[in-house]
């Protein structure tokens, strides 16, 4: 198991793990019969089959029978991929189509991941937190509870350039659209990061920051809290 606390260990894992190109291959044949093996699955009968597995394993078999195959069609969405996508079927969270979530990501109860979001290896999405459309959480980036990561916002990861400390976003933080949180930054509980801000240093709890580089413009008050409150109906699956 890879040590997610070390950027170099993650990079080494990506380098050394067997790369895969998962595919679905549709095959028509007039004379052959195919069955599943320990390398791939086969569905179908009577000359029409669907293979599911790694491209190299499947083609090794099909190439041997090329003269007896009348037609093929290959569907794929990656090539030589090091890290598979996370199996999210058991997650008690709302995950919308088009989100890309890699393996070894933690998704806590009632989290929301919207269309087009990208979540890298080792990231953590806390309970009730929302990752909005096209937002990015880099490797080991961590959101606490009830965080809103705005559309197009970026939480930098620990890979390239390597960083010993991941971005930590504490509970009840709102990060506006297209904001960028750079490597190693910690955003304190209840803080607000304005849209488009570039955060290069830690933000204290309850602060409101804006600009590039982001600066504290005020402390969170009742008016700001009302403008940035979350909607529970978007999160609760019970």
Swiss-Prot record:
Record Pfam families: DapH_N, Hexapep, Hexapep_2
Keyword terms: Acyltransferase, Amino-acid biosynthesis, Diaminopimelate biosynthesis, Lysine biosynthesis, Repeat, Transferase
Lineage: Bacteria, Bacillati, Bacillota, Clostridia, Peptostreptococcales
Family: Belongs to the transferase hexapeptide repeat family. DapH subfamily.
Pathway in which this enzyme or protein is active: Amino-acid biosynthesis; L-lysine biosynthesis via DAP pathway; LL-2,6-diaminopimelate from (S)-tetrahydrodipicolinate (acetylase route): step 1/3
First-tier enzyme category under EC: transferase
PANTHER family, alphabetized: 2,3,4,5-TETRAHYDROPYRIDINE-2,6-DICARBOXYLATE N-ACETYLTRANSFERASE (PTHR43300:SF10), ACETYLTRANSFERASE (PTHR43300)
Stored NCBIfam families: DapD_Ac
InterPro entries assigned: DapH, DapH_N, Hexapep, Hexapep_transf_CS, Trans_hexapeptide_repeat, Trimer_LpxA-like_sf
Biological source species: Clostridioides difficile (strain 630)
Name the record gives this protein: 2,3,4,5-tetrahydropyridine-2,6-dicarboxylate N-acetyltransferase
Substrates-to-products reaction catalysed: (S)-2,3,4,5-tetrahydrodipicolinate + acetyl-CoA + H2O = L-2-acetamido-6-oxoheptanedioate + CoA
Role of this protein: Catalyzes the transfer of an acetyl group from acetyl-CoA to tetrahydrodipicolinate.
EC number of this enzyme: 2.3.1.89
Any one biological process term the GO annotation gives: lysine biosynthetic process via diaminopimelate
One Gene Ontology term of the molecular function aspect: tetrahydrodipicolinate N-acetyltransferase activity
